[in-house]
């Protein structure tokens, strides 16, 4: 809800400022211009926010997810069978399940992988990070985090959640995994 209020306020204020600046030449009365600009900006912000809420909710319904705890930064912690090198290789393979993804930083000693996802109509690109930590010789913890590249993103229409779901499902098909910490409310698929 906080994201939607911020989105509403930002879009209202920006559009109000544009209306006020554009209307200053037409009207000599500053009070009329400010009231007109703020009113139109409020209506525009409300309209844009309602459209974004509708699109966002339709993506969630289509994915079969609820709205609780939804964020633009999504992560899940899983336990995978295999040694650290095998699990890192599996993580690199699962990158293909996300469109427009490119492998970025790979640090096998620290168990860090960074993936960059290209721009699409839902976001200005995403950054996916894998943190692989060996528990035993045959088990590893993997934390998968997906976030927008543009840090000021308020609404991503479920794109980063979709990234985490695709990667998790791909890992499930290739290895035996167990979900340890589900921060993005993914139901078992």
Tell me what each language-model feature is.
Residues 2-5, 19-189:
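Ser/Thr-rich, low-complexity intrinsically disordered terminal regions
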Residues 1-14:
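N-terminal membrane-targeting/pre-transmembrane regions
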């Amino acid at each position: 809800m906080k994201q939607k209020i911020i989105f509403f306020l930002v879009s209202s204020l920006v559009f109000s400022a544009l209306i006020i600046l554009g209307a200053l030449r037409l009207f000599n009365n500053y009070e009329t211009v400010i009231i007109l600009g703020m009113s139109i900006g409020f209506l525009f912000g409300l309209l844009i926010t309602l459209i974004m809420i509708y699109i966002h909710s339709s993506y969630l319904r289509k994915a079969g997810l609820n709205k609780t705890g939804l964020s633009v930064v999504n992560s899940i912690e899983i336990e995978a069978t295999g040694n650290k090198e095998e699990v890192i290789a599996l993580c690199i393979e699962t990158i293909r399940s996300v469109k427009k993804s490119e492998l970025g930083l790979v640090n096998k000693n620290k168990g860090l992988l960074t993936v960059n996802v290209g721009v699409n109509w839902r976001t200005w690109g995403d950054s996916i990070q894998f943190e692989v930590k060996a528990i035993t010789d045959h088990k590893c913890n993997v934390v998968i985090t997906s976030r927008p590249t543009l840090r000021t993103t308020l609404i991503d229409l479920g794109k980063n959640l979709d990234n985490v779901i695709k990667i998790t499902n791909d890992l499930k098909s290739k290895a035996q995994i167990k979900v340890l910490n589900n921060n993005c409310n993914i139901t078992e698929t």
